[in-house]
């Protein structure tokens, strides 16, 4: 293990730490407590993948809430230009609507460009009535 900024780093080619790995496979109270104490809620690996990306990939609602409350940026991009919300809603999951609403409550920008269209237009293209209701509730232009 490598020590970096007082956090234990696992030796790997993308500079990912223990929290990063755990977010992908674990939903324990211990992980949530560890998250509450992270120094940088916007941590990104060498590919630009953030803790929030990982929590969204895992559809871990509680981890997402904690990260956003600590100041994680809901509009952060990885190096490919993908924001965390697409990691969640890009795959069918029962938590998608809740995740979308939480992200919007914390400043997710529906006008943000994702793959040549706004996030709002992309979400509407899914033709999911519940998601579209959530978008309508938060979209003010």
Labelled PLM ranges:
Residues 2-54:
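N-terminal segments that cap or nucleate solenoid repeat domains
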Residues 30, 62-63, 98-99, 130-131:
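Conserved ankyrin/ankyrin-like repeat signature
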């Amino acid at each position: 293990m490598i020590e970096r900024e007082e956090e234990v780093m696992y030796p790997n080619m993308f500079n990912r730490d223990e929290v990063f790995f755990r977010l992908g496979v674990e939903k324990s109270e211990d992980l949530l407590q560890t998250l509450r104490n992270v120094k940088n809620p916007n941590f990104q690996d060498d590919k630009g993948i953030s803790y929030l990306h990982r929590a969204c990939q895992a559809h871990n609602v509680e981890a997402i809430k904690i990260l956003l409350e600590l100041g994680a940026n809901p509009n952060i991009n990885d190096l490919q230009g993908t924001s965390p919300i697409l990691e969640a809603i890009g795959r069918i999951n029962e938590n998608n609507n809740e995740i979308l609403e939480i992200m919007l409550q914390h400043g997710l920008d529906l006008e943000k460009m994702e793959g040549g269209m706004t996030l709002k237009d992309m979400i509407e293209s899914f033709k999911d009535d519940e998601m579209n209701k959530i978008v309508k509730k938060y979209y003010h232009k």
